[in-house]
């Protein structure tokens, strides 16, 4: 017996409650076994981190529902947080994580070469995003701002400054 990602997603709709929501879901089907990977997001945490307790609660509830609707299903269930250096869902996460350091890979208008940098989002106006170069530990330095088109951003992740 197998289970689809749509079925799991439907179950999670009934299991999850705000501020915790689904970040991603993967269901890998094998001939006699399913690997179900659920990644969670916390909308109220500055970095979107989900606690171990929240992961356990979702795992327990999802397991109960799976066993109720599909008792013969052979599966492995992994429930986790999206993580501190999660991949950003662009462009929405640029607004959500404004002011928090992010690592961006982008194409500049001057060259087609990929560039990478660590920035803080200052403002977003339509397809334009104003960024401030992140400088670790330097508080009194004049902040250099740059503007990018959203279409030039190839990928982004949160950046944890340790």
Curated annotation (Swiss-Prot):
Report the domain of life of the source organism.
Bacteria
Which stretches are transmembrane? none
Task: Give the source species.
Answer: Leptospira interrogans serogroup Icterohaemorrhagiae serovar Lai (strain 56601)
- Keywords from the UniProt entry: Cytoplasm, Ribosome biogenesis
Pfam family of this protein, just one?
RimP_N
Q: Which family does it belong to?
A: Belongs to the RimP family.
HAMAP family hit by this protein = RimP
GO BP, sorted A to Z: ribosomal small subunit assembly; translation
Name where it's found.
Cytoplasm
- Its function? Required for maturation of 30S ribosomal subunits.
Q: What is this protein called?
A: Ribosome maturation factor RimP
User: What main location does UniProt list?
Assistant: cytoplasm
Question: NCBIfam families, per this entry?
Answer: PRK14635.1
**UniProt gene name:** rimP
Matching entries from Gene3D superfamilies are given as: RimP-like superfamily, N-terminal
Keyword Transferase attributed: no
Q: Name one GO cellular component term.
A: cytosol
């Amino acid at each position: 017996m197998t289970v689809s990602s749509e079925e799991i997603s439907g179950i999670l709709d009934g299991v999850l409650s705000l501020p915790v929501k689904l970040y991603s879901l993967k269901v890998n089907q094998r001939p006699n076994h399913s690997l179900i990977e659920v990644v969670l997001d916390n909308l109220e945490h500055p970095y979107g981190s989900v606690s171990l307790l929240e992961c356990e609660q979702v795992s327990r509830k999802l397991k109960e529902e799976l066993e109720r609707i599909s008792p013969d299903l052979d599966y492995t269930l992994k429930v986790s947080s999206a993580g501190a250096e999660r991949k950003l869902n662009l462009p929405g996460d640029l607004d959500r994580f404004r002011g928090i350091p992010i690592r961006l890979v982008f194409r500049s208008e001057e060259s087609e070469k990929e560039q990478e940098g660590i920035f803080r989002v200052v403002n977003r106006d339509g397809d334009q995003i104003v960024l401030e170069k992140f400088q670790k530990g330097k508080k009194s330095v004049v902040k250099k701002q740059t503007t990018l088109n959203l279409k030039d951003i190839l990928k982004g992740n949160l950046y944890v400054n340790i």
